Amino acid sequence: MAEAVNVSPMGGEQRADGAAQKLLVIDTTYTMEAIKVRGIEDSVTCRDLDGFFSHVWSVHPVATLTTSKEWTAPVGKPVHYGLNDRHTFVEGKIGRFPKLRRLFVPNFLLAQLGLMWWLFRLIRRERIAVIRAGDPLYTGLVSWALARLTGIPFVVRVGGNHDKFHEETGQPMMPRLFRRRSVEKRVERFVFRRADLVAGANQDNLNFALANGAVHDRATVFRYGNLIDRRHFVAPASRDGGADACARLGVEPGRFLLYIGRLEPVKRPQDVVRVLGHLHGQGHRLKALFLGDGTMKAEMAALGEDLGVGADMIFAGSVDQGILAQLIPQCAAVVSPHTGRALSEAALGGAPIAAYDIDWQGELIKSQVTGELVPYGDAPALAEATARFVSDKAYAERMGEAARAAALEMLDPDMLDEHERSMYRKLLAKSR
């Protein structure tokens, strides 16, 4: 029998007993420091689904693994931040007591057990309706344990294809915690099989989950659209400040390639350097602007020097979403070896995109329809695809417009919000 849905005075939907629905998200994607630096608060505050949940607690259980010491002490009690009336962000720490700093493992366990106990009490006190994990590994295990202890359903969102990551790098996703990929595979199957709902960020990520134990009739896709800053949905021609943003970063409108993402091996940013070298060899004097941080910066700079393009490479680090939205329409092309949400932002900005056929990129980029898609790892083909945009401005403009149209259809945030709400309604109805 269909369940009637009530709306509480606070704006969130109500349970059968009249209480507003509340959500707990356990996710390690971003720390509060990274959220503030990049201006991506929308990626957290969207989790209430436009008031479907009256309050959302977003918890990063091991935030101080990656935060700077200037931001917060690495050990101690969890830190709480109020984003607005509906959202609380909690950062767990990698140790509980400063005096045990040298005993990392026991101190880590004390911190995590303390956080688990706090979350257990939070679920009971606030009558949280559902738990959502950000991955099928550590946060998936924590979410499963809390769900079992409290009797509420849990959802796993899958934001990557871990099998392909291992194939590309030979490394496990979380080497410090699980050591080997074989251990991670067992954990993933355990979590996927027990999840009440598995949601891939795209079809490729969902296919990975289905191949590793997720149940078909408890699986769906929650795309990136409602996680994206609304400034990226503004028509490119209506975005002010692009020329000024270019000037501040040392590039000229229409005279630079753009890479958005982490400078890490799995993302293959070094291939963008090779693309730049190829274009210089053809006489195209462009620069390459890299927006993101990571361990490969020095290696990429050295490669640029070897190829004679080092002086035309700009490493700008992470930038605010407002600046990013200004920059995208100004570039000659976006080069996307392997990106996630950044590919959505690039397409919404109407940029011509040259991409590898990896992960979900082929779902959005179709060769000569919405951009150029080439075999994964084929840097010469990626360079030729990019060169086509640089040499044929009219073609580049057509591909950029087509990419934006496809992204607007695929990533409509209102449509995606409603899809997520409908899946949560079904899930919560089954749990009663």
PLM-predicted stretches and their roles:
Residues S367-Q368, E372-A379, R388-A394:
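Conserved acidic donor-binding segment of nucleotide-sugar-dependent glycosyltransferases
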Residues A298-V319:
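Nucleotide-activated donor-binding/catalytic signature segment of Leloir-type glycosyltransferases, i.e.
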Residues M1-Y81:
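N-terminal subdomain of nucleotide-sugar transferases
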Residues F178-D240, V251, F315:
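Donor nucleotide-sugar binding/catalytic pocket of nucleotide-sugar-dependent glycosyltransferases
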Residues V44-D48, F120-R121, L141, A145-L149, ...:
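Membrane-proximal helix-turn-helix segments that form the acceptor-binding/catalytic region
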Residues I328-T339, A351-P352:
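Acidic donor-binding loop of glycosyltransferase active sites
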